[in-house]
């Protein structure tokens, strides 16, 4: 018996809570859950439905479905027993059996599911035992929370005390100003204020400086935002540090955030961050094979440009390991042409497909940088060789434009981190996405809708998205930009071995291949 997932979904197939007990991608579980309502017939009394690959064991709970997805070899009686246990647990943690109630208690339900099912197998537990396990408390956690709360309270008390002292100093200064003694006692009050502020530990660091600077005590008082201080409006008494610049900067950042921009704080990198660097390669020799795509596809079909540019680069850590030759092989692809580095023996490469230096006594360069040795291009490829095809179908209906986009991926590549960027007309609100296979994000500043698919493999070679925007010209949604990567290449070039030019065993090596997009558009 193997339970693949335990889920709570709506009648329409919307996933509210789902706990997977085996390694399963999000796209696959969403597809299985979305397909379930179509398989359930009306008026039938069965509690399970079978497909070609999985079995659904389900129970309606008011307007929702409690669902187990299992493999077809599982014991249906044990599955039903597990389902009964979960059906008793759900009301214990979600008294309101509707979408909102289930979503609010999602984590509690997942924890309960974990206590009832372990690695796809039912645990021999009761409802009371599950509740007891989930409610177990940690003494260390309680002590830590009490300690943190104590520190928060202590800090709050110190802040209140300092605020009270500042208010008293302000009142004292106001009385002195009215009595005509401000010229005598003013600087002393300011000096005392700086001494008190240094106690808080915040100071005036980060490049602001205090040399030759006096400060108006109104800037320390608590005021409503946007109300200028007396020092900001009164011309030069020589007493005031104007804080208007910081306020304007904050307002500008807030306006950018309101437009959807992601604002990163401008901070100096810490010593810890400055020490972080990419991990060095573990093998003495590393071969990197990379192909870049430059593709322009017509929206009505056909290809304007399809260009593949590849590079074989070598990284050698030690000089002693640089006296080597690389034996390579590749697929016989039409239109494939190679170009070698001037220091590479071209005759040896053309006759035996061996990458070696012209001078055998001269090693390959060593260090942390990669050295490109061979480049190639592939010309004359047609639309049937595209790794990913995208079609866009905008249609205006009344006061709305319905846009349907679909993708089809070739069998020869598994694509990673796919992002399809669709330009949109200027909108006041985000578009209404009706259906999507994957995730979406709206960049309001650039007016671009980004459709993201983490992985395209055999389980999802095709997919679609539908969204609605106000009336717009169909050409507004072009050009569509596409980005992705793959771990295989068109040429399928690889290193099959390393020949040492000096006595001894060949050094250990590793190789990595990747296909990336330089410019991939539908126009």
Curated annotation (Swiss-Prot):
SUPFAM superfamilies in alphabetical order: Second domain of Mu2 adaptin subunit (ap50) of ap2 adaptor, SNARE-like
Membrane topology label: Peripheral membrane protein
Cellular location(s): Cytoplasm; Golgi apparatus membrane; Cytoplasmic vesicle, COPI-coated vesicle membrane
Record domain MHD: where: 282-523
Entry-linked Pfam families: Adap_comp_sub
UniProt entry keywords in alphabetical sequence: Cytoplasm, Cytoplasmic vesicle, ER-Golgi transport, Golgi apparatus, Membrane, Protein transport, Transport
GO aspect biological process, one term: endoplasmic reticulum to Golgi vesicle-mediated transport
One cellular-component annotation, GO: COPI vesicle coat
Region annotation (Disordered) ranges: 218-243
InterPro entries the record matches: AP2_Mu_C_sf, Coatomer_dsu, Longin-like_dom_sf, MHD
The family this protein is said to belong to: Belongs to the adaptor complexes medium subunit family. Delta-COP subfamily.
UniProt-listed PANTHER family: COATOMER SUBUNIT DELTA
Function: The coatomer is a cytosolic protein complex that binds to dilysine motifs and reversibly associates with Golgi non-clathrin-coated vesicles, which further mediate biosynthetic protein transport from the ER, via the Golgi up to the trans Golgi network. Coatomer complex is required for budding from Golgi membranes, and is essential for the retrograde Golgi-to-ER transport of dilysine-tagged proteins.
Description of how the protein assembles with itself and partners: Oligomeric complex that consists of at least the alpha, beta, beta', gamma, delta, epsilon and zeta subunits.
Protein name as annotated: Coatomer subunit delta-2
Provenance organism: Oryza sativa subsp. japonica
Lineage: Eukaryota, Viridiplantae, Streptophyta, Embryophyta, Tracheophyta
